[in-house]
Amino acid sequence: MTYFMFLLLMALVVGLVAVASNPTPYFAALGLVVAAGVGCGVLVGHGGSFLSLVLFLIYLGGMLVVFAYAALAAEPFPEAWGSRSVLGYVLVYLLGVGLVAGIFWGGWYEGSWVVVDGLKEFSVLRGDISGVAVMYSSGGGMLVICAWVLLLTLLVVLELTRGLSRGALRAV
């Protein structure tokens, strides 16, 4: 399990570097999918299965807007991963991550990252699942507002990427 978590954390770093280097919107969207999926996998590995599921669904809603932008912002000659500028950014980011990891390497194993009920022998309910009732009772209105904001953002991105003459909403 330790090797699997190490692999997930390294994939998370690679996904975040792919988003930060941002060669074209296509590849940045792919890096965002990798980072979101692997980040939720790290949460599942540490026992937060419900939190991971909710965050991944929120990421999918946000990535819908990113995919709409990436599909409509087509470039005739997109920069790929092999171009010099993108490789320069990737190397700088990876060296920065390596430098920061080298500085803070000692002492990372002194703490423990455990879910609230992870130390109990027999637990009927998990700590992250008991938050479902609170999320839907107290936060139900906020969930509806967030859904409408994501829809509005999607429509704004679709309208802005088509220009003034032919809007995406007029074509329907």
Curated annotation (Swiss-Prot):
It comes from Cyprinus carpio (Common carp). It is found in: Mitochondrion membrane. The lineage of its organism: Eukaryota, Metazoa, Chordata, Craniata, Vertebrata. It is a multi-pass membrane protein. GO terms for cellular component: mitochondrial membrane. Its EC number is 7.1.1.2. It catalyses: a ubiquinone + NADH + 5 H(+)(in) = a ubiquinol + NAD(+) + 4 H(+)(out). This is NADH-ubiquinone oxidoreductase chain 6. The chain crosses the membrane at residues 1-21, 25-45, 53-73, 86-106, 140-160. Its main location: mitochondrion. Core subunit of the mitochondrial membrane respiratory chain NADH dehydrogenase (Complex I) that is believed to belong to the minimal assembly required for catalysis. Complex I functions in the transfer of electrons from NADH to the respiratory chain. The immediate electron acceptor for the enzyme is believed to be ubiquinone. Keywords: Electron transport, Membrane, Mitochondrion, NAD, Respiratory chain, Translocase, Transmembrane, Transmembrane helix, Transport, Ubiquinone. It comes from the Eukaryota.
